[in-house]
């Protein structure tokens, strides 16, 4: 019996734009972290993604709560899952890095403030961020993906379309 050949992995240059389009359309992601005992915790967050043509980087404007900080100190890997009612889903597995320097926080603030609808929004609407990007309760979380999956709902519902998966 002959072995089936491994399917060719699509290039990041094919998967990343499809991922960004779907993620920015869906907007909200379930983001999972793991504590020091290996127990997962999820929360709903609002990432924004930048595709340079060579590199995909995600950013989350978030409060650096003690729980998030402890989880990411213990294990800096996060899993993001997006879903919409048409069953379009996309996932990103990433290394997360806290960014507390003022230049990065201002840049991420501006990414959201000037981002296209529906992913863009004014971060100043969050009461604890009233002091702007230098607020103690505002941090930038950088996401560097090592795996992406884009799964159009049409694949599930009608058997049409293509699932795209990339990993580093």
Where are these regions (language model features)?
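Alpha-helix boundary recognition
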Residues: 23-24, 73-74, 113
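Short beta-strand or tight-loop elements
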Residues: 27, 43, 76, 136
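A short mixed-secondary-structure module that forms the rim of ligand-binding clefts
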Residues: 48-87
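Structural detector for hydrophobic anchor residues on beta-strands
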Residues: 27, 56, 92-94
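Extreme N-terminal tail/first-helix region
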Residues: 1-29
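A short, Trp-centered hydrophobic/proline-enriched beta-strand micro-motif
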Residues: 21-36, 78-82
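Charged, gly/pro-rich active-site loop segments
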Residues: 2-11, 89-168
């Amino acid at each position: 019996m002959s072995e089936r050949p491994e399917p060719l992995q699509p290039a990041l240059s094919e998967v990343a734009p499809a991922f960004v389009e779907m993620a920015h359309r869906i907007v909200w992601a379930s983001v999972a972290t793991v504590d020091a005992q290996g127990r997962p915790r999820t929360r709903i967050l609002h990432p924004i993604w930048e595709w340079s043509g060579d590199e995909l980087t995600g950013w989350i404007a978030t409060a650096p709560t003690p729980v998030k900080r402890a989880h990411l100190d213990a294990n800096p890997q996060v899993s993001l899952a997006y879903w919409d009612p048409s069953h379009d889903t996309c996932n990103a597995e990433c290394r997360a890095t806290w960014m507390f320097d003022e230049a990065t926080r201002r840049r991420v603030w501006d990414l959201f403030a000037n981002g296209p609808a529906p992913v863009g929004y004014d971060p100043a609407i969050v009461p604890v961020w009233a002091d702007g990007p230098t607020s103690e309760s505002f941090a930038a979380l950088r996401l560097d993906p090592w795996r992406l999956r884009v799964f159009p709902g049409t694949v599930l519902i009608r058997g049409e379309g293509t699932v795209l998966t990339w990993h580093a």
